[in-house]
Amino acid sequence: MKRRPAFTLIELIFVIILIGVLGAVALPKFKGMRDNAKTTSELSTAASVQTAIDACHGEWVINEGTFACGFDIDPADPAQFDASSGYPITLGSSDTTPFDKILKNGKSVKWIKGADGYYRGPASNGGVKPANPDIAGKPDSNDYWEYNSTTGILQLVDN
């Protein structure tokens, strides 16, 4: 009777243990990658909004105070455009959807307009859990975005 080459039971157990250890080390890294992707996407969207705001202001400067932005904003309406600074007050349809004219899903974001005229909206609707300790400049569910229509600045406010 010929002996056929095969793996011993010890070798198989060793391979199973090795796969288990590699899986235990790799899984937490993949979880962090998902949160990083969501955070990067949110920061990219915020940069796009800031670019649109800056483009409107740039057109106002080039046209010497005449507002001619490509968005559907009425320059004569003081609720939509700040004639003194050249920044759009809203790039949306209402106080609760201030960016729906420039964001594809702008209506689904829950923004509010404060008494101070600032728009505030939640950061990290994608479900990125709060970091402990909080990392400045990285949006999580404790933070919020703030748009100042006087200065045209959209910024992340860390809580």
Pin down the residues of each PLM region.
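Membrane-proximal N-terminal amphipathic helix
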Residues: 35-63
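Long, low-complexity, serine/threonine/proline-rich intrinsically disordered regulatory regions
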Residues: 98-102, 106-111
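Short, exposed beta-strand/loop patches in secreted or surface proteins that constitute
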Residues: 109-113, 144-147
